[in-house]
Amino acid sequence: MTIQNLNKPLFSSHYLEFYLPESPEWQLDPSPIFERLKSLYLAQKDLLSSLNEAQTEEEFIKPALEILGFSYIPQIITKGKGRAERPDYALFADPAQKSAAYSEQNNESVFYRQVVAIAEAKYWERPLSKVSSNDQRDIYKNTNPSFQIASYLIGTGVNWGILTNGREWRLYYRLASSTATEFYPMDLVELLESDDLARFKYFWLFFRREAFEADSQGKNFLERVREGSATYATRVGNELKSLVFEQIFSQLAGGFVAQITQPGQAVKASLVYEATLSFLYKLLFLFYAEARNLLPMDRDYRSYSLITLAQEIAIKIDQKRAFSSKFFIYQKLIELFKTIDQGDTSLGVPRYNGGLFHFEDSLSSNQPNHFLLSYQLSDTILAPVIDKLARFEGQAIDYSFLGVRQLGSIYEGLLEYRLIIDNAETGQVHLENDKGDRKASGSYYTPDYIVKYIVSHTLKPILTEREQQFKVLMGEIEQLQQQRNNKKLSLETLNGLSKTLAVLERQAQTILLDIKVCDPAMGSGHFLVEAVDFLTDELIQILNRYPDHNPILKMLDQMRQSIIDNLRSQGIQLDPSRLEPTQLLQRVVMKRC
């Protein structure tokens, strides 16, 4: 069971692979803990699949937490809008902290200040991102574990949370850009059965007690890794932006200009600029989508992917081999763009419904995609450009951890410039802004804490008001559902109740979801992305308080099925578990921003 979630990663995989092994923690030996966890698993292996939630906790999860070094207190209440909510475990660094916390059980804020993390446990291999209705092994019915852990983190104010079904372990961070959709998952059983100590070391380092303990600087191991990941993303983003402005854009645009120039024919600089911008963002989009597994990199698509092409180019560059003056790479890319646009059943690629890769309607010679079909770039130009976009300091760039601040700022910055053609025949061009400056200016970024403050104080009052209206509607929906259970009602009465119920459900969906956010000067979209993340997390808290007969949860289930049916109509099979409600909800919110 290899975990392939489509969530945004909590840490940079590049940082974990290349920087973490240089840390003091990496030099520690995980083998004693590995042997204890493996012995625990082997002793219970034949029973685990038949155990309910409480039994799974007793036989496997509690012993595992103890092996990982935690002291814990089970089920301490936290209030969510007046509703009692209980994270399964409050985790402590040592027995002394646990003992001190016992005396503060009735003082929620004081109690949770002593907690290093919370944990939520489910029965063995229970799906962690979906409602499991009418499952006898669940203690609480109609709950979504990923909704629960996000709500508990926000409700308690604890920064770190563990969600597990015994096999899959997820790490959540309250201060992530989106508490619900960013997490770090690991398959413990796969690690134990493979006897791969190097991979197990990641699990041990990130889920043991010591990972949550603050050092003399007030930061724990997880926070240091998170900061290191963010620093890496910032450095890569700055390098990419510098390369795009100083080399890449001019090399691409100059290549187009040199190819289309004919005696007596003027070259339209604005069209070359727009086509180059479109081409560049197709490449960045694919690097990002492939790194995030938004395209099926685990299937035959990989051999056709941009990442694979970039790896082949890197090998040739490192071996100092020559590239052709023909257009082999460009033609491969155009075919790849068309595959993304039209889909390819045999490769497991669905149709992309955006306009970025759509060529069929680009009949006008003034459209960028028509331009890209009409002209080409040689391998000698494209190969080094792709390599610069693909590698940083000799290693593949971790595009999965880059965000709107890094990639969006490139696009935002380019919009301030125009293309100047110095010599059309040789393809000499440069970028210049309205002031005549050639060098990319330093863009001003609103600090994250200010963005979060503005978004929160703008949207929170609206959500608070909407939730009160939603609460009233949910009360009416609950009453109608109870009335419909009366077997003595006539068919006419039942039909009338069903019609009224449908109206109330639509109203409830509209109340919570019809919140439109507009940023007229959006730039890179930083504010809108924060608004989407904020709304998603807040809506998850609200939905978690109403797990029964919830019309929005019902709508998300219908949306999932609609996507699955649409893909099947294209001949593409998709594991439904990959369409998590958190991501579907985020998609709904995004469409309104």
Report the location of each language-model feature:
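Preference for the N-terminal adenyl/adenosyl cofactor-binding alpha/beta module
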Residues: 1-50, 139, 167, 183-537
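A short, conserved, highly charged catalytic patch centered on acidic carboxylates
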Residues: 1-160, 175-181, 220-229, 234-238
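Flexible phosphate/Mg2+-sensing switch loops adjacent to catalytic phosphate-binding sites
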Residues: 73-79, 145, 179-184, 299-306, ...
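Core residues of folded domains in eukaryotic genome-function proteins
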Residues: 115-117, 160, 511-513, 591-592
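Short acidic/His/Gly/Ser-rich catalytic and metal-binding motifs that mark active-site loops
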Residues: 126-130, 419-423, 540
